[in-house]
Amino acid sequence: MALQDESLGIDQLSVDYDYLVYRISDRVKSLELEATRLVQRQNELVGQVSERVIDENIERFRGVLRGLDELEEYFAMMEQIGMITDSFKERLDSAMAALK
């Protein structure tokens, strides 16, 4: 029963990891697209700069920065998953050694 629980845990960890990688990839693409749009818009407005436009762009870039903060959290989650898998590998190696 414990082995089956461990197997389900590994499966869930794998699913969680894949989903996290997908979310990171999706978020990176989204942020890249938004940053590209902002830079293109900024270039278009170089000749027509106004304080209002600058403030709007600053707020949008702050949004991009918030998105990057989210990405940092995702990478921290990935690091935690790595630590969990390392710990599991050590326990598995220990269990295998005990069985020999």
From Swiss-Prot:
GO terms for biological process: endosome organization; regulation of protein localization. It is found in: Cytoplasm. Its main location: cytoplasm. One of its GO terms (cellular component) is BLOC-1 complex. InterPro entries: CNL1. The keyword Ribosomal protein does not apply. It comes from the Eukaryota. PANTHER family: BIOGENESIS OF LYSOSOME-RELATED ORGANELLES COMPLEX 1 SUBUNIT CNL1. Component of the biogenesis of lysosome-related organelles complex-1 (BLOC-1). Belongs to the BLOC1S4 family. Component of the biogenesis of lysosome-related organelles complex-1 (BLOC-1), a complex that is involved in endosomal cargo sorting. This is Biogenesis of lysosome-related organelles complex 1 subunit CNL1. It comes from Candida glabrata (strain ATCC 2001 / BCRC 20586 / JCM 3761 / NBRC 0622 / NRRL Y-65 / CBS 138).
